[in-house]
Amino acid sequence: MRIVFLLLSVLFSIGINASNFLSIKIAQSTLVEETPKITVALPASYKTNITKTYPVLFVLDGVANGDLVNGMIHRLHLSNGSNEHIIVGVTSSNRLRDFAPTVNNDPRGPVGEGGGGEKFLDFLESELIPLINKKFRTNNYNVIAGHSVAGLLVIHSFQSRPNLFQGHLAFSPAVWWGERETLQATKEYVATAKHIQNYLYMDIGNEGGEMRQVYDSLVQTILRHRNIDLHVRFDEFEHETHDFTMAAGLYNALKGLFQHQQKIGV
């Protein structure tokens, strides 16, 4: 009930207040086909506490999801349930192209789509993160959040570039994509890596069939093999559709993130 009340409060606040996000200028990328739209929301204390540094939360599909994330973090911070964060919205005009790591050839999905995920991570690592660090007071703790195919990129980053982000929030990640390359690579990573100091949140709604089976197999592998430094939290929302799992899981995702940050001294 508390989560529902908090979510309604956040959504109401978003509805009556203008967005806190501002667009920032970024040079034409040399790494991706089309430079994403970048928006930034600064914490309430940013201008008054001029010596404080902040963790950064990169929200994929930032135009659609940035206000929800920023509002929830603000509400949690007021009740000592979250650190303040710089929120960076990252919005692609072609999600499948930029977020899916591999090209899909399965006729049950969009054939021929995807394949740009690695280039998009290159963009984040080599162009966007350095720019954010230069423009704003950051503390080198970075989090990435995404839903569906954007959640797939979050999981891909978790296993392929484990030091790029210290926190990963994946809401209904599309780990069924293609030939399930990201699924298999992630299973292998958690089963063989000796040290994973990170935070991983995943959830799923009422998705069924193979989508649910694939997701469950990943959760089981992570729980079976995770080491003590990997802080995980998984949720199932049986009465929520795929489209609403980010809204449903965000409170728990951010609470778990705060616990992890407290544990490691962020």
Language model features with spans:
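Sec/Tat signal peptide C-region and signal peptidase I cleavage site
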Residues: I14-A18
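Bacterial N-terminal signal peptides
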Residues: F5-S13
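Non-catalytic cap/lid and distal C-terminal segments of serine-dependent acyl enzymes
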Residues: S19-V266
